């Protein structure tokens, strides 16, 4: 047919073997490149390795492209990916992939943390189990060697998991907090701080782990409500007429360290006692002075509190205010020591019981309350109750550093997203206590301090020669893991050396992490970065208006991943989810899209199996839709003249551009949920469910018998299909890299001007979506009318008991509603046949549209089995009634309403509303059925 030959020329078809024999005139069927079904496990590993081998993820500091850089929050070297990591990595990877597509030179720098306590504890436990030895049996050097062996053997797990979920990091730049370069940076920073007078050694209160025998940080202390006993002890005379006070404690054993009793200065009950002394029950040489202090709450208990300055942080503060002695009554293992009493050598819990019994014998136990539930801090690693304990440790003086950190946010040099987290930042940095940086461990950065035989203290930098000779020795402690982590943004790029990486990529563009470590990690990075900038401006540069350089321009704080009921994931609840299980069961894209679709700045993210299945189904939907489009000739190419396109063509292109703009705006604000939810709704609800269905009508089923106009329309539809698919796959690539890469390669394979991979393809702009055209309001209106008409007719068919596959003769006036061009599409979408002469109306419906109310008459005779329909409806009615009963039962339970999360209650109310509507609809339908 001549007209087809001319159109093939217009379509620029290079496949000369393609013939107009009823086949697709565009050329070979590209869908043949795709297997019958989407199987992520079959392609993900090879796709990822191909990206790595092609060097797509490598950063070039000599590039002229604008820089975009992120440093990966370093996971524990022997750790495994948990859902919090998976969220972190998904969001960072989405940012990195999008920025590459936007033409940035991207550095996403990976690495891992030596994780002092976590790693040492794990290795010690393994050695105890396998060899029956502890670290002291080996000695320091041999034990550290064992830890390195463990790290080398088990340290690659999380890296393999990162590859499995698609992290586009530059593996050639992977760092470790104990590698030579970072060790040099740590020693340099310690020396700089020490020389500036910001590092000092002192006796201070710390969280002490008797099992680990080290101080631990606040973040490594987990609080839980424990059952204990509240014991009231009488100090002073046993005669009521003589001076005495009653104090209460849950830690009876600490009374061996009591040096005073505190009361409120305005508490008249104790006015005469203030300044007097009370004898200690077990230590006759110790007199406990009664002091007045505003800390005491006169309304709580007896209004008097015991003061144990060396074993309670609040008591320590009072001890400093009143210049009290601070005897430490417990050794590193949690045993009573150096009290000169019969209790020395007892483990703390044994001593608690023995001391209580001894006090009872003296008649000093006034009351016992058991069980008494109170909050107790436990070591996250060793699980035992932490002991507040006065200990000589190394500290960083934070006042100056904290001020610079606060100023960095106040000035806008670094911006926190969401801004609602700013008050928490200022609460911490404006009221920060000096930071204990020493740990009594062997695995880590050893403190670079040497002590001489005559009391000398020497701090050595990496290029200094450590003092040697008789009597000289290095400090035994190591630095808190957070010390080296605080240097991460710039030490990983070569500081303290001046490097091309620092010049190109520092400060980093954005830090992505959870709000729960805003203080523990983020604030400390800000402190060290601003300090380093101030002292080495020639390396790190200077910030705006001469202020210290910040380590990251933006701080994006996401929430915690919770279970589908909003509960924190924990071993005790058994509600934890291993992200690698989802990768195995649903594919990496399903995991990533579930997390990206739910992630908003600062908000917690509830996830469950249903969400993962939904994301898996979305990937499958994309796959099947692309395969169908390719089978029908979808291809990339120049858009035809806009006036030649159908309303549906213009509508889908304009909607694509609207969604593109929304996605760009949302991602620029780190609103991943908004961006991906809109992509999901557009791709599934508008492109797959609507435009693809209309495209089936616009593309000829038999090209041989098609008119010239139908062939032209079909070819234009194929190009629009290709254009929309091209853009949708690009927009979804940051969140779903594997399925989009697979489909995009099938769509663009061999096309001139297209890159080999989506990783390096251009990010969509208006030119790529709808050619930069203005939205066609008439097309939008008509498509909205088609949407409403089809939806109402489908619902009406269902209400009439017509099976979805059953074609029904129908009369309706499309011209009156300005939908004449959509008659074929609507009839196809609703399965309506053109009526014959013997048409007999059995049902009708009126649908109000924008231009007119359209009347539709249907002939359903012979299409409905009344008895079967009645049985089906009665079954559905019973199901709706059951749902209503269940909802009413739950919503009528006051105990349930008080405990259930608001989202759960809202979900039940919504199901109740839907069930009520369903009940009423089915009832009406049953009443309308012909009587038997």
Curated annotation (Swiss-Prot):
Protein localization: Cytoplasm
Matches recorded under SUPFAM superfamilies: Anticodon-binding domain of a subclass of class I aminoacyl-tRNA synthetases (SSF47323), Nucleotidylyl transferase (SSF52374), tRNA-binding arm (SSF46589), ValRS/IleRS/LeuRS editing domain (SSF50677)
Residues in coiled coil: 863-929
Motif ('HIGH' region): 75-85
Recorded GO CC terms: cytosol
GO terms assigned for molecular function: aminoacyl-tRNA deacylase activity; ATP binding; valine-tRNA ligase activity
Name assigned to this protein: Valine--tRNA ligase
Organism listed in the record: Corynebacterium jeikeium (strain K411)
């Amino acid at each position: 047919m001549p007209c087809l030959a001319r159109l093939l020329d217009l379509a620029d078809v290079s496949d000369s073997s393609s013939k107009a024999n009823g086949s697709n005139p565009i050329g070979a069927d590209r869908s043949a490149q795709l297997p019958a079904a989407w199987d992520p496990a079959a392609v993900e590993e090879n796709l990822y390795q191909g990206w790595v081998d092609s060097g797509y993820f490598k950063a070039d500091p000599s590039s002229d492209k604008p820089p975009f850089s992120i440093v990966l929050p370093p996971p524990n070297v022997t750790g495994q990916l948990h859902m919090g990591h998976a969220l972190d990595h998904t969001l960072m990877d989405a940012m990195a992939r999008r920025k590459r597509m936007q033409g940035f030179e991207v550095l996403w720098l990976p690495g891992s943390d030596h994780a002092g306590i976590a790693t040492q504890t794990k290795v010690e436990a393994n050695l105890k189990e396998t060899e029956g030895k502890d670290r002291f049996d080996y000695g320091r050097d041999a034990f550290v060697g064992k830890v390195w062996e463990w790290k080398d053997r088990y340290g690659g797990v999380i890296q393999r998991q990162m590859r499995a979920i698609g992290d586009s990091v530059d593996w050639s730049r992977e760092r470790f907090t104990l590698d030579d370069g970072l060790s040099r940076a740590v020693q340099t920073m310690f020396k700089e701080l020490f020389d500036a007078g910001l590092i000092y050694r002192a006796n201070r209160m710390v969280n002490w782990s008797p099992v680990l025998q080290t101080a631990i940080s606040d973040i490594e202390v987990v609080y839980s409500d424990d059952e204990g006993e509240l014991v009231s002890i009488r100090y002073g005379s046993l005669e009521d007429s003589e001076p005495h006070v009653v104090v209460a404690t849950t830690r009876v054993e600490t009374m061996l360290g009591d040096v005073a009793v505190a009361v409120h200065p305005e508490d008249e009950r104790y006015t005469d006692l203030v300044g007097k002394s009370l004898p200690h029950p077990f230590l006759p040489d110790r007199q406990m002075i009664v002091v007045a202090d505003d800390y005491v709450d006169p309304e709580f208990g007896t209004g008097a509190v015991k003061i144990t300055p060396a074993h309670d942080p609040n008591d320590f503060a009072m001890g400093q205010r009143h210049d009290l002695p601070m005897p430490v009554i417990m050794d590193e293992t949690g045993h009573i020591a150096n009290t000169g009493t019969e209790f020395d050598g007892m483990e703390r819990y044994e001593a608690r019981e023995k001391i209580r019994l001894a006090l009872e014998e003296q008649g000093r136990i006034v009351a016992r309350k058991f069980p008494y539930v109170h909050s107790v801090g436990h070591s996250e690693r060793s699980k035992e109750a932490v002991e507040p304990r006065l200990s000589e440790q190394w500290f960083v003086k934070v006042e100056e550093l904290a001020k610079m950190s606060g100023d960095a946010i106040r000035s806008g040099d670094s911006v926190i997203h969401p801004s609602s987290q700013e008050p928490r930042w200022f609460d911490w940095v404006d009221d920060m206590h000096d930071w204990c940086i020493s740990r009594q461990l062997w695995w880590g950065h050893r403190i670079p301090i040497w002590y001489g035989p005559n009391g000398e203290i020497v701090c050595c930098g990496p290029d200094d020669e450590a003092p040697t000779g008789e009597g000289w020795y290095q400090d035994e402690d190591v630095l808190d893991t957070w010390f080296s982590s605080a240097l991460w943004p710039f030490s990983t790029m070569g500081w303290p050396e001046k490097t091309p990486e620092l010049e190109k990529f520092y400060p980093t563009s954005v830090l992505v992490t959870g709000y729960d470590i805003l203080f523990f990690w983020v604030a400390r990075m800000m402190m060290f970065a601003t300090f380093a900038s101030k002292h080495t401006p020639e390396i790190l540069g200077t910030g705006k208006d001469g202020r210290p350089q910040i380590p990251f321009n933006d701080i994006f704080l996401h929430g915690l991943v919770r279970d589908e009921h909003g509960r924190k994931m924990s071993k005790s609840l058994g509600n934890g989810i291993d992200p690698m299980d989802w990768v195995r069961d649903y594919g990496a894209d399903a995991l990533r899209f579930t997390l990206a679709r739910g992630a908003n700045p600062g908000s917690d993210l509830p996830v469950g199996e249903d969400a993962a299945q939904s994301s898996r189904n979305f990937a499958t939907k994309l796959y099947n839709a692309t395969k169908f489009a390719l089978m029908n000739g979808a291809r990339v190419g120049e858009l035809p003249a806009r006036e030649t396109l159908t309303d549906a063509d213009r509508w889908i292109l304009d909607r694509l551009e609207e969604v593109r703009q929304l996605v760009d705006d949302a991602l620029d604000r780190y609103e991943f949920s908004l961006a991906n939810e809109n992509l999901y709704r557009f791709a599934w609800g508008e492109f797959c469910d609507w435009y693809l269905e209309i495209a089936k009508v616009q593309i000829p089923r038999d090209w041989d018998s098609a008119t010239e106009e139908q062939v032209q329309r079909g070819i234009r539809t194929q190009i629009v299909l290709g254009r929309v698919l091209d853009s949708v796959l690009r927009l979804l690539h940051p969140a779903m890299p594997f399925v989009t890469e697979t489909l995009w390669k099938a769509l663009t394979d061999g096309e001139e001007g297209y890159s080999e991979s989506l990783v390096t393809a251009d990010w969509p702009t208006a030119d790529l979506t709808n050619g930069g055209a203005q939205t066609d309001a008439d097309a939008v209106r008509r498509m909205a009318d088609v949407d409403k008409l089809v939806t109402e007719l489908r619902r009406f068919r269902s209400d009439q008991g017509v099976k979805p596959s059953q074609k029904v003769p129908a009369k309706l006036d499309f011209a009156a509603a300005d939908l004449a061009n959509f008659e074929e599409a609507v009839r196809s979408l609703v399965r309506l046949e053109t009526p014959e002469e013997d048409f007999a109306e059995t049902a009708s419906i009126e649908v109000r549209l924008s231009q007119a109310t359209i009347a539709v008459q249907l002939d359903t005779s012979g299409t409905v089995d009344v008895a079967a329909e009645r049985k089906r409806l009665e079954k559905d009615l019973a199901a709706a009634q059951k749902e209503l009963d269940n909802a009413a039962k739950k919503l009528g339970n006051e105990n349930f309403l008080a405990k259930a999360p608001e989202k759960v209650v809202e979900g039940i109310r919504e199901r109740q509303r839907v069930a009520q509507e369903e009940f009423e609809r089915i009832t009406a339908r049953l009443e309308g059925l012909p009587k038997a």
